[in-house]
Amino acid sequence: MNDGVLPQNNEDASVEATLHPVGISFSKSSIAAFAEEGISEIGIYVYMDGSLIYGEKQPLVHGAIEVPLPLGENLQTFVVANADEVADADQLSTAVIRQNDNMQKPVYISEIIGFTSDNSVKSLDVELKRLVGQAVFAPVESQEEMDGIIQFDALDITFTNVGVAYSVKEEKAVLEDVTVRTNRESDFGAYVYSFPTENNGSRTSVDVAYLKEGVIVNRTNGSLDTGIIFKSSKRSVVHMEILNEDWVETEWESMIEEIDF
């Protein structure tokens, strides 16, 4: 993969002179979102005839960045923030954004922008929008009920059909199941971000495994069909009675053993 250095021709010293600095500035809403999420750098990817000529992460300085580009060319670019990886970026047609954090943080991306790098283009105004949607698992029990739970001390929440990677060109997600472990400290709640799944024709369900001291002691008696389709900047909340015995394979009462002591 090109690390952001333009191709050089050692036999032609004039190549460097043909580079044209193009500024990239961001909207106030984008800068505000970056500050809120603690984002301090962004990735810029520029393509000529579909092939990468510049791909680099840059620190944000006053919300503007300057990129050296070849003069007089028709180019395409996209900008991404808070992504763990942009894989297969050598070609625009194969560039895929991936997350490696169990989908626990949002990703921001611009549209693919076409422009000509002539002297009249001093700067590109870029707006990054939150690409991901979010699903939240929220138990409905009261705090008093939470405090009285002795049957388990953690939950593994599995969200099915989560968009864990995203094709920039095709605007389509790669789907996998994602499991998030939660416990009493977070009131047994959990969440996951997902790239949009509208173009995948799939819906998300939830499976819950109940654990005590790291061992599964119960689980839901089937996937809970939530009907969730992930959409950019949309949050869906799944409310569940985690103590309701109608939802689990084994009644909690039957798991309690009384012995003399």
Explain the meaning of each model-derived region.
Residues D84-S123, G214-E245:
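Structured interaction patches on ligand/partner-binding surfaces of diverse proteins
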Residues D125-V132, V192-T197:
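Conserved "repeat-terminator" motif of extracellular CCP/Sushi domains
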Residues E127-G148:
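Surface-exposed interaction/gating patches
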Residues T18, V61-G63, D118-S120:
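Ser/Thr- and Asn-enriched, surface-exposed coil loops between beta-strands
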